[in-house]
Amino acid sequence: HDLKTPITAVKGYAEGLMDGVADTPEKRDKYIRTIYNKANEMDTLINELTLYAKIDTNRIPYNFAKINVGEYFNDCIEEIGLDLESKNIGLAYFNYTDGSTQIIADPEQLRRVIHNIIGNSIKYLDKQRGLINIRIKDVGDFIQVEIEDNGRGIAAADLPYIFDRFYRADASRNSATGGSGIGLSIVKKIIEDHGGKIWATSKESIGTVMYFVIRKYQEVPNEQSINS
């Protein structure tokens, strides 16, 4: 259904161009931009479905590396901030970890996690001024990432299921937002493949907080250093 929606729109606007319905430069420009945007939607949907098929059958090639938490998230936030600014969405970022804190993670897939969570938040922002808060905390042997929005929130009855594939809270209301319905299930799988855990809290009309934890990297002392 979600793939068919942009295809139907592309066909409709293309037919409008061919039939001469778009009879002014402004209308033609609008139709062409809509076709382009819907084609991008299809591309994103296909990429998500392809990725999920790989993840679901454990065929995704993770490239784990030692990552400095502060440096990595600073780079991510800079990139995210530009995108949110273009959408007139406010961003606040707080990193409470030590400057030397490291994790073992796949940089590309962890970035996908962050982008998917924020992309999902953006879809459901309903306030005049959308806000995203990102906090990185030190919680014992783990780092905890919190991504908070001031969107419409999620009903308590729906909250336990938001990471299930193809699950949509109030699907009839949300159909206009688009998407594959598997973005958060991809996020959950990637975090679990990193040995972490993800969950959410939410209040309707106030907003949602997504949390995930990843174990910190700790040097294991070798036998020689112990004996010395």
Regions found by a protein language model. Give the residues of each.
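Short alpha-helical segment of the dimerization/phosphotransfer core of two-component systems
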Residues: 37-42
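Conserved micro-motifs of the catalytic ATP-binding
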Residues: 57-62, 102-105
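A conserved beta-strand-to-alpha-helix junction within the catalytic ATP-binding
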Residues: 63-81
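Conserved catalytic submotifs in the C-terminal HATPase_c
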Residues: 63-66, 85, 90-101
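Short helix-loop "hinge" at the ATP-lid/N-box region of the Bergerat-fold HATPase_c
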Residues: 121-122
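Short conserved segment of the HATPase_c
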Residues: 154-168
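Conserved glycine-rich
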Residues: 195-196
